[in-house]
Amino acid sequence: MKFKYGATLFSGFLGLSAILAACGAKGKFDQVDDGKIVLASSLTSKNAANALQAVVEKYNQVKGGNDYPIEITQITGGYDGGRGNLQTKLSVKDKTTFYNLI
């Protein structure tokens, strides 16, 4: 009974250590702090895009002096275009033109 408990406990720690090793900082990168928040949008509906633009404009008008302004960048191709763009920017570790929110 002790052997089974010990083996189960050991295998749990082994699995946990593998997960922690996979989550290491090897692939990490930081963006350049450019003083703004870039919001990527892949909205295909003009009404939805206009509504998002109105919300961002209102936020930029009422934000505090220490808060970053928000800019919207449009990603073409809908959700598929957004996914492809995100994968590309992550794989090349784009530090300067990468967006902060999607």
UniProtKB/Swiss-Prot annotation:
Subcellular location(s) per record: Cell membrane
Family: Belongs to the MG185/MG260 family.
The organism of origin for this protein: Mycoplasma pneumoniae (strain ATCC 29342 / M129 / Subtype 1)
GO cellular component: plasma membrane
Lipid-acceptor residues (S-diacylglycerol cysteine): 23
Extent of the signal sequence: 1-22
Bilayer topology term: Lipid-anchor
UniProt keyword list: Cell membrane, Lipoprotein, Membrane, Palmitate, Signal
Protein name from the UniProt record: Uncharacterized lipoprotein MPN_363
Lipidation feature positions (N-palmitoyl cysteine): 23
